Amino acid sequence: MKHFTQDENKSTMIKLDMNIWQSLINDSSKRKIPRYMHQIWISSVNHEEMYDRFQIAANSCIELHLNYNYTLWTHEKIKSWLTIYYSWFLPIYENYRYDMQRIDAMKYVLLFHFGGIYIDLDLKCKAQDLISAMLPLDKRDNEPDIILHMGAEGISANTDIMAAKRFHPFFKLAVSQLKAANRWFYLYHLTIILSAGPTFLYGIYRQFPFKNVFYYVPNSLLFGKLIECVGGETWHGQDTILISRFMKNKMWSSFMAFALIIILCVIFKILKKARYR
């Protein structure tokens, strides 16, 4: 996938964007991440009402963040907003096969346009002003551009909770790559994580040369102390269970990866011979 590979022209554009960005944030008002909280509920096919446990979790975040602007983005609200502000992105949004892809894609669009913090609906808030609470004291006066917590190294950047300053080049890059990444990857789970989800974002992260703009929240601080999972994973399919077991068993996964490489090499040689007959 292109967003996992180095591209000299893309790298130059990122550097130009960062030069412009850094010239704009000298204003003291830009030192803080906007106090805007985004959550998303999309059920475009079944038109389901939001689950009670998600509503309870959302209420906990609202009650602890009365000084934040809060928006629950629904399918219809997103379409109306995109029509006004990002009409060119509406076909990309509508062409996704799954709602989870739409949710992931909109996380990046909303954080780019508004800035603030995005939180999945299955996360219950346990602290006030999460943006400040995630940061050490020495980073609270001049907050980092982007706050993330990483998944497994080399595989994903978690997207369940993220914070960012408005119009940041990192999320501009992410949004710009969504259309090209929207492909079918043969499995439901792989399609979601590679086309718009955590693995997609990790590819963008690898492309982005300015790693000093990120702050990584330790999972030991985040979970249990600042937020609590109330049971989500509503998007997981049968293949998710298989992939999870595969990843947890290192010996089995290494063997399967090796076997897959051998099979692909054999297929490649067969096709190459057939081509020159």
Residue spans of the language-model regions?
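Glycosyltransferase-associated regions of secretory-pathway enzymes
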Residues: 1-103, 121-277
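Small-residue hinge/turn detector
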Residues: 104-116
